[in-house]
Amino acid sequence: MRPFKQSKFSLVWTQNDPQPRMPIAHMRNQNIVPQLVPWKRVTYWRRLMNSVSAFRNGSSLNISRKLSMMRKRHTIYTRSTNGYSLRKSKVLSVGGSHLKWSKSIERDSRKANEEATLAVAAYSKKESEKQSGQNNTSTASRNHLARERVFRFGSLRYKMDSSRRTLQRISDVDSPCSGPSENGKGVKRPFIPKRLVIGNEEYVRFGNGNQLVRDPKKRTRVLANEKVRWSLHNARLRLAKKKKYCQFFTRFGKCNKDDGKCPYVHDPSKIAVCTKFLNGLCANANCKLTHKVIPERMPDCSYYLQGLCNNEACPYRHVHVNPIAPICDGFLKGYCSEGDECRKKHSYNCPVFEATGSCSQGLKCKLHHPKNQSKGRKRKRTNEPSQKNARRRYFSSLHNILSESEPMVFNRRSTDSEVFGMESLDFITLGTAEYEAGDDNDPATVQSISSDSESLISIYNLITPVALMQ
């Protein structure tokens, strides 16, 4: 390229050039021909001086600012003749020499930058692949060493493959047993057994012992052993089931699988006792429940637990049981093997329902809820105090009875011994129905009855056993 020559009509400005003074001197030395009207010369000179001062102050700052913004490209600017404008001269400054700028130079520079970037990227990629290849080879070698296990049997070495199916003999050239001896006779190889057990695997020797193969029959034997073990386990479970008693047969005396299909034991001696028989109400000659009374089948005696049972021949179980003790499961199934030694309750009724009249489990409760019996017991309890009070009043004194009711009317046919012996209480009435329905309405008869009653009261007070009744 040719060096750039300065134009006659413009001055060239570069970034590194000092502050130019050539335009100002040129303007000073320039001869201005006054071709204007005389009365406008002052105005012309005034505008000219203002433009020069503005160029010195403002234009230089703007030029330096623009040059600093375009520092990377080293763009060269040209100034007009009067110094009032700047424009690109399409010339590049490279290494101090001025070159004419063109689009081809820019395109070549961009292409060179792209090629350099691609070269750097390819080099970095190649380096990374090289490092990864080294890592892969190291890991592969480690895995290969980890997969290949070497075993020594005597003086021979065997290598196991990755599948652990074969053991291949490793040839050892330096081994004294591989080559012939000085006398020309081969060294005798060490003895290798036909079967080798390594861990849980068994290997069989083939040929002269150069290769050991995992025994294919070992898996068959393992599966056969597992099958035998499983069959023995099932047989033990069947025996354990047969040792258990059938709940239906023990509790109700019959089972739907009584034809031999039931896996549980049907023992007639373990059948539950008939509750109707205990109450004296069972008249069935073919009753499926037992009528034999033994402690293993009998429930607890409720009167004995309250301390009220005096029957020496009571068929129920007489055992002191804790009130908060649970109910015996064996008894609920029909037979408790512990009998009188059992410290649990032998009862079919729900203790919570008996105590409170309701059960939180509701229909899910497996115990019996005697609804009718609970109502009857409640009524009986409400009637008990009135009966006790009536007996006490009757046996202690008769003044209260006479004061609260009408005069008693006795049958003439009954004797005093029968009345006081309480054998003819049916003839005693406390109401007024029979008194009003009597045959005699004579007041004399009433007076005789009242006098007789007073004599009877005095005699009764003398002979009544008050201390015994209290």
Curated annotation (Swiss-Prot):
Changing residue 365 to S: Loss of RNA binding and reduction of ribonuclease activity. PROSITE patterns: ZF_C3H1. The keyword Ribosomal protein does not apply. It is an enzyme of class 3 (hydrolase). A zinc finger (C3H1-type) spans 240-269, 273-294, 295-321, 322-349, 350-372. It comes from the Eukaryota. Residues 131-142 have a biased composition (Polar residues). InterPro entries: Znf_CCCH. One of its GO terms (molecular function) is DNA binding. Changing residue 343 to T: No effect on RNA-binding and ribonuclease activities. Possesses RNA-binding and ribonuclease activities in vitro. This is Zinc finger CCCH domain-containing protein 7. The lineage of its organism: Eukaryota, Viridiplantae, Streptophyta, Embryophyta, Tracheophyta.
